[in-house]
Amino acid sequence: MTMHNSVEFQDAFDVIVVGAGHSGCEAALATARLGCRTLLLTLNLDKIAWQPCNPAVGGPAKSQLTHEVDALGGEIGKMADRTYLQKRILNSSRGPAVWALRAQTDKREYAAIMKNIVENQENLSIRESMVTDLVLGANDEVIGVETYFGVAFQCKAVILTTGTFLGGKIWVGNKSMPAGRAGEFAAEGLTETLNRLGFETGRLKTGTPARVDKRSVDYSKMQLQPGDEEVRWFSFDPDVWVEREQLPCHMTRTTPETHRLIRENLHLSPVYGGWVEAKGPRYCPSIEDKIVRFVDKESHQIFIEPEGRDIPELYIQGFSTGLPENLQLQMLRSLPGLENCVMLRPAYAVEYDYLPATQCYPTLMTKKVAGLFCAGQVNGTTGYEEAAAQGIVAGINAARFVRDQEMIVFPREQSYLGTLVDDLCTKDLREPYRMLTSRSEYRLLLRSDNSDQRLTPLGREIGLIDDRRWQLFTRKQEQITGEKERLYATRVKENDEVGKAIASNTQQAIKGSITLADLLRRPGFHYVDLDRYGLGNPELTPAEREGAEIDIKYSGYLARQQSQIEQIARQAQRQLPRDLDYTTVETLSKEAREKLNKVKPMTIGQAARIGGVNPADINALLIYLELRQTKHQTGLAALP
């Protein structure tokens, strides 16, 4: 770290964002759009918002994050809607709480459009540079950054979004080189600066599969995976929707020969060979991990996905590996359809430094250094969507910090985004964190379709939702409310022709009469069925019809979950004293005292979600707080 009195600044900004990946772009755009003079520093101006692994956005829980970022005024959803190659709804046979939109994207088009957006954003400057040091003020607050070549920039807040570049090292077999990703050098010096400031850092690992030439594969031996006929959208803004021809993906499977090659050469893998000890992502394992962990499984699905419309590269999803390059081609050619494939880029593993996010407040500002924020993979997450969500949170709060406004904590019962940040800041995570629907106890309320209803009013209040978007939002909500009123008020009689037809076709009798809302509550009956009987409203958009149907069909479950939230919230939002020394609370278990003192939760709800803190500890803590408050009030009463 460098102290302010020894630095000459070249320029001054309100906010500096370090790293221009998916987190950095959201953070920089948010601060700039909120009126802060922002500098976005990146190692390579040609790799802004690059998708170094799977060029895709969405999937289970990740699509909810993408919708939520858009609802707040962010960019990732718009980008996916502009650049998709294929779109599919996953889990469509299940309830709306777990529906997941996934888009395969054109990675070069995605990066080019995002680069154009950040280059033309008012209040935002971009520059190629490697940040190696932080400049601190007299009170150990951040006041600037210094680059590898000795240039310093002044600022009031810094957002670190360094991805896999901090101390990055890529591995192919037992060969390694310093790099944040293939062909790009690692960031040096910043980890050492953070360690000197007292931050704990650790190492994590991830990987990416080989890329093959699409002209060298035989699709006839694979299973076709087409996109959905009805295209859905991540963004709530129709102006960014682009109707385009979809490209197919394909599926193949591993064979006994694939498994033999991997098992016989496990000792050549960087992890199984003992050269890399960093923990990899549990929910996106390498192919060698799959073979070891699922010994009884005879075959694994492998998806063959295009990386762009105008390039020959195919992404081999589910086949990431750190095995030697000369072995990788044999493995690829053991897959049906890839017997004669040409490998364009080898697979590799990458290990990198991260900061356990328990060192951050839920605002994503660090606890040790005022004005320093962290977002994305540096916080121990994996995935573009998780990174983008943290980026917009850090950007919003950095802008508010600069303006001396109260920073925003997103409660976990309000959004997946809030669940993500809350988990990161309260749980001692030692492996890359991926968002899952199962991580949210409120997932029935936190659906993709109502992300705007939950977050757009907040985005408007913050200043990221303009008048046009606000009008779109309010009209949609008015239409849904009006349609629900109509559905509750309109009745179908059993003796009407339409009533007889419905009873006959559904094999369910109508006794006297029934409201359209009660029809929608019936299993297997949907709004499209109302249309079939001339009972729908043709003036509504698909999103408005779906919103009304879901609210009515699941109203009982929604009300029950809302009641649970309110009950928990009565105690969960209770503030914990900042100066509370948990080691002195003898009624807490030893582990709870240690964990609580390390994390320093802001509320009872956060304390309850810390690993190692059980319900008995929470009860003991509540009793302690009551006794402390009583003692304080007694002391005040005794004063003359």
From Swiss-Prot:
GO molecular function terms attached to this record: flavin adenine dinucleotide binding
Compartmental location: Cytoplasm
Listed GO CC annotations: cytoplasm
Keyword line: Cytoplasm, FAD, Flavoprotein, NAD, tRNA processing
Names of required cofactors: FAD
Statement: the UniProt record of this protein carries the keyword Amino-acid biosynthesis: no
One of the GO biological process terms: tRNA methylation
Family as reported in the entry's similarity comment: Belongs to the MnmG family.
Subunit structure: Homodimer. Heterotetramer of two MnmE and two MnmG subunits.
Stated name of the protein: tRNA uridine 5-carboxymethylaminomethyl modification enzyme MnmG
Gene name per UniProt: mnmG
